[in-house]
Amino acid sequence: MATKILALLALLALFVSATNAFIIPQCSLAPSAIIPQFLRPVTSMGFEHLAVQAYKLQQALAASVLQQPINQLQQQSLAHLTIQTIATQQQQQFLPALSQLDVVNPVAYLQQQVLASNPLALANVAAYQQQQQLQQFLPALSQLAMVNPAAYLQQQQLLSSSPLVVGNAPTYLQQQLLQQIVPALTQLAVANPAAYLQQLLPFNQLTVSNSAAYLQQRQQLLNPLAVPNPLVTAFLQQQQLLPYSQFSLMNPALSWQQPIVGGAIF
């Protein structure tokens, strides 16, 4: 009896499972739109899972972190290219003068290659060009740069600030040439005035040819109506500027004695 009841229950279970079963053959001609209807709940549940959401958030954060430095590097590279373009355009403006300077003075040409680092060239082009013209007429400054770089830099600063350079460039050039002779002559004048007078003789052609006329010319220098020798006049002006020279900064007491010695000689 019990065996019959179990067999009947098994038959009922098979009947119910057979009526509710849905079989899709492998070679079925059913449209592909029906298949996602059965897969949609599974996929939606998979995307809504916390692990999947955390992974997607991590990927988004990693992408944003990696893209930010790349953008910054691109901006920096663009700014660097812009600066290089501006510097190249400024250098092209001075290329004709630099090519001539390369033939005349290669050392000065190498110094002019750093135009972008020169504040005077960027701030005032006219003053920079004037300074370059003055440097062409001052070969003594290039020699001074090799012997004493500190004094050369100080001389370059005085070029843009001296009113004599702006007003009268030839007088300034003559003054610069005389400055090479003045330190040795002033020391000689303090040590030995007689030797100082003899040292001045080679600089005056009139002294070599006619000593009497030379003495007469020295007396005429005291007369403001007389026509003086330009070289001697420039030298007298240089004697008046001695308190402002480097010699006066080193020894102020001896600097105040220089006009007295010059006045006694001339």
UniProtKB/Swiss-Prot annotation:
Signal peptide: 1-21
Keyword presence, Signal: yes
Iron in keyword set: no
Keyword terms, alphabetized: Seed storage protein, Signal, Storage protein
Highest taxon of the lineage: Eukaryota
InterPro entries named in the record: Seed_Storage_Prolamin (IPR051529), Zein (IPR002530)
Residue spans crossing the bilayer: none
A Gene Ontology molecular function term of the record: nutrient reservoir activity
Function noted in UniProt: Zeins are major seed storage proteins.
Further comment found in the protein's record: The alpha zeins of 19 kDa and 22 kDa account for 70% of the total zein fraction. They are encoded by a large multigene family.
Protein family: Belongs to the zein family.
The protein, known as: 22 kDa alpha-zein 8
Species the sequence originates in: Zea mays (Maize)
Designated gene of the protein: AZS22-8
